[in-house]
Amino acid sequence: MYAHENRLTAWHIGIAFVALMVGMLLGPLQTWEHAGLNLYPALRSIGIQSYYQGLTIHGILNALVFTTFFITGFLTFATTHSLKRASKYPWVHTLALVVMFAGLLITAVPLLLNGATVLYTFYPPLKADPAFYIGLTLVVVGSWITGYGLLFTWSAWKKENPGVQTPLIAFASLITMVMWQICTVGVAVEMLALNIPTFITLFGYGYRNVYELDELVRVTDPRLSFEGTVAAKK
């Protein structure tokens, strides 16, 4: 009954934990760097050129890729099993996974080529290759598609079970997905309107002009700001 959903869940969560493991391996390198032990030259053969490149890969894999893929996989499993119903449109969930994985691959290329070294995740006005932002946007959009698939399934379940309250786990999963979609709208807007060089920048609304409005931001090195923030939190 849940064969398709279980396979998709396995793919989502499998990708999530692979990303987590790889990201975690880069974490100690940052600690050792601050302790005066620079191991990055030994990693250049596998594409890791510097502390800041490793920091970006670590942030993307742990904070974004792991979170997004795990959420979509877990909520798909929780919703369908709680409703005791297979997905209304299985192809929607398959499409979501394909879009997310394609986005991950597109993002990985500039990351490994040192074309997206923009601190922990992405910090404008540092500039990455457009493919980096496009790939991450696809990951977010894919997670939205998963959410739509869950809503379609819940709507079908409601029609089949009139007057029956939605099971708590399914209800919580759907609310979580709706909140996720609302919260990630800002990420997608930042990618499309500020970071990706698109037609928007032709009319003077790109990130360059936005940040030039503030002299302090314009002349401050983002790396120094980031390190200062980390030090302040400690």
State each model region's role.
Residues 47, 159-162, 195, 204:
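Short, flexible coil/linker elements and helix-boundary hinge sites characteristic
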Residues 9-37, 49-82, 90-116, 131-154, ...:
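Hydrophobic cores of alpha-helical transmembrane segments in multi-pass integral membrane proteins
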Residues 1-2, 82-88:
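Helix-loop boundary elements of multi-pass alpha-helical membrane proteins
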Residues 1-9:
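Cytosolic juxtamembrane amphipathic/interface segments immediately preceding
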Residues 42-44, 120-124, 197-217:
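Membrane-interfacial helical/loop segments at transmembrane boundaries in membrane proteins
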Residues 5, 158-171:
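Hydrophobic, small-residue-rich membrane helices and short re-entrant helix-turn-helix hairpins
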